[in-house]
């Protein structure tokens, strides 16, 4: 894994036309894998919020997210307007893949399978970040309760997403069709295409709230204001 990451770093340096600095760059790269992870994550502060959120989703989502779901999950927090500007014809699979690679600083990837998912490039990344509290050591301002705080933030991402005016965005009928009808099936398919993260957000907003509560973060205010059926 160290070799794979180092080759990627050197290739990026070469792509920038800095061939003469490759030897120096190689000497600067930590020889320990976990130190290399730390170096990658702290090399610059560009889009740090996006990086942390991407890592939180890959670490703590209830189930692995599709690339499109992760793209929307991140933007639901960092740039909500991008959710309603989503156009699958413009935001291609390649664009989403490059976004995930960039957001994660190269530590997450998209699987090559019939149903692609976003995951860490190797289990050692998860071990470093979670089991060894890598994020807490790198960014102590995130606090000692990183897992609880992460679920709190993921809950808020879900809440932001399900707060989108779906009817206006999808431009569907004024009156919702009956559930078993063909029209309803077509509307659900359109919603999945245009709002890929909607199903996950609806099904798991309370899961993340419950897990945050288990991590010591009170959800009393959230539950009081949440539109539960009476």
Give each language-model segment a name.
Residues 1-230:
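Leucine/isoleucine-rich amphipathic helices and adjacent mixed helix/strand linkers
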């Amino acid at each position: 894994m160290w070799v794979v990451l180092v080759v990627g770093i050197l290739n990026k340096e070469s792509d920038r036309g800095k061939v003469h600095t490759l030897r120096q760059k190689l000497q600067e790269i930590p020889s320990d894998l976990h130190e290399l992870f730390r170096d990658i994550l702290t090399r610059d502060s560009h889009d740090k919020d996006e990086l942390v959120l991407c890592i939180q989703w890959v670490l703590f989502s209830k189930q692995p997210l599709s690339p499109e779901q992760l793209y929307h999950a991140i933007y639901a927090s960092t740039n909500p307007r991008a959710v309603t500007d989503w156009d699958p014809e413009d935001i291609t699979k390649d664009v989403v893949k490059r976004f995930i690679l960039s957001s994660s600083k190269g530590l997450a990837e998209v699987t090559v399978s019939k149903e692609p998912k976003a995951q860490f490039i190797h289990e050692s990344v998860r071990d470093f970040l979670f089991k060894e509290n890598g994020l807490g050591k790198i960014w102590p301002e995130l606090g000692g309760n990183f897992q609880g705080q992460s679920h709190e933030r993921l809950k808020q991402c879900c809440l932001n997403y399900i707060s989108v005016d779906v009817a206006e965005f999808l431009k569907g009928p004024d009156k919702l069709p009956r559930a078993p009808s063909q029209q309803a099936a077509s509307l659900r398919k359109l919603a999945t295409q245009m709002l890929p993260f909607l199903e996950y957000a609806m099904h798991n907003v309370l899961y993340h709230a419950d897990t945050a509560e288990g991590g010591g973060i009170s959800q009393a205010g959230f539950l009081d204001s949440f539109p539960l059926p009476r």
